[in-house]
Amino acid sequence: MSKDNIRQYSAPVYDGIENAPARSMMRAVGFQDKDFNRPFIGIASTWANVTPCNMHIDGLAREAEHGVNQASGKGIIFNTITISDGISNGTEGMKYSLVSREIIADSIEAVIGCQGYDGVIAIGGCDKNMPGCIMGLARLNRPGLFIYGGTIQPGEGHTDMISVFEAVGQYAKGEINAIQVKQIEEVALPGPGSCGGMYTANTMASAIEALGMSLPGSSAQDAISEEKRQDCHRAGEAVMNLLRLDIRPRDIMTKAAFENAIKVVIALGGSTNAVLHLIAMAHTAEVKLDLDDFVRIGQETPVVADLRPSGKYLMSELIKIGGIQPLMKRMLERGMLDGSCLTVTGKTLAENLAEVEDYPADQQIILPFEQPVKKDSHLVILKGNLSPTGAVAKITGKEGLYFEGPARVFEGEEGAMRGILDGEVQEGEVVVIRGEGPKGGPGMREMLKPTSAIIGKGLGQSVALITDGRFSGGSHGFVIGHVTPEAYEGGPIGLVENGDKISINAETREITLHISNEEMSLRRAKWQKPEPKYKSGALAKFAKLAAGADKGAVTDLNLDV
């Protein structure tokens, strides 16, 4: 059997008399003699019926397998997990969301490493699938690429998942009744695909395309479409080309490529989760990326997309005018992107964009750089005595650039949700939700229910929210998350008391707790570290291993090896 260099990993596992048992196992699943001479390509599928984001991915995986086989490889489908943030948000189950990113990366690494696959295609739909898949690819660094599962269609009346969350707040305010909430619930999500705005899934898919780790156009295709089917088929050809050229993920995932990804995320008005995930992905690829990079890049990159949650349009509408490729070409022509970066096509970013046509002249989704939504980044990195090592704010400018008010403190999301819905939270206040960090939560839950309730109750312009947890890509308003150090680690957010004045200045990038140093020291002396909430299982392991949010909350940063 062939032992050429494109079978570098499969040959030691399957070739030779000594490996007859391994071949026998594979014959049981349908392999024939000819298949053992082909490179083995693992296809990591996140298919599941637990969420519309992933319910169609089994078909996409089979299409990718067909593409691999037609390109003279041998595709082998295996599954990893997915969870649904949209279902678990606001519950104890949401603590597993960020944990699932690590489990996805671990499981892809484990299967590819164990089974001796020469290349990898990973297919993801829901939020944590994207970074988890990329981290899995980067760890073993075998030729591979990512396929995005695609976007859901809009619901009736231009609704989407966030419409349902905000309907709950409208109900609490008395603006709509229970029947109307149910009517929105029934029509907001019409079928397969990831949540339809520039929320976390579409943000990360766009970032991965800009990074060069998915095929051109992959991030902006409807979940059920001929374009997505072809994307999967072409991925089979692409991974075989990467094998022949010996191009590996870390050849593509350079510092310049990550900076391209950050710029595209900002231009699109993408999710705060991109900060967390891009830092984690870069760590796995052994690229130094930190919050200071987001500050530097953010000062020179405007927001030009009028997309939900802060804007008007849905991803399906951006798809109709050309997706993100014309935007990237505009950015390249302005010198904003590094066109020399290598991509999974085997070509540079500039080569991929050479023939891309501009958007239609009458479109209103992507604005001119001369008339941006915001002249600099909406992802504002804040530091100050409340967050010495950094926090991430999502401020488009529609909320204003400065907020000051008395603190309304809640120990965890559930208490905050009750306080908002019951009218405890008043205009002008700064809601502080703590004990939700990577270690303290554990799991760094998203505060989508509280932010949606604030918006639904009409407080979006008059209340700010600060947390050591995260936000959904669907959150909007004056929101600051990823506060570090987190409360569980003794961070200042754990010392805030009701009524303390807090100020947030997006222009100077400062977040300040207005108490004296002496008072801060007195409170710190009284502070006691909470007991871990979990003593065994996945959440306990994550709490023990997770780095701070400013380090991507990865679980392999401080291992004593």
From Swiss-Prot:
Catalysis performed (reactions): (2R)-2,3-dihydroxy-3-methylbutanoate = 3-methyl-2-oxobutanoate + H2O; (2R,3R)-2,3-dihydroxy-3-methylpentanoate = (S)-3-methyl-2-oxopentanoate + H2O
Root EC class: lyase
Presence of the UniProt keyword Amino-acid biosynthesis in the record: yes
Residue stretches in coiled coil: none
UniProt keyword annotations, A-Z: 2Fe-2S, Amino-acid biosynthesis, Branched-chain amino acid biosynthesis, Iron, Iron-sulfur, Lyase, Magnesium, Metal-binding
Entry binding sites for [2Fe-2S] cluster: C53, C126, C195
Cofactor(s) required for function per UniProt: [2Fe-2S] cluster; Mg(2+)
Gene3D superfamilies reported in the protein's UniProt record: IlvD/EDD C-terminal domain-like
Pfam family, one: ILVD_EDD_N
Similarity comment text for this entry: Belongs to the IlvD/Edd family.
Complex formation: Homodimer.
Record-given protein name: Dihydroxy-acid dehydratase 2
Organism: Acinetobacter baylyi (strain ATCC 33305 / BD413 / ADP1)
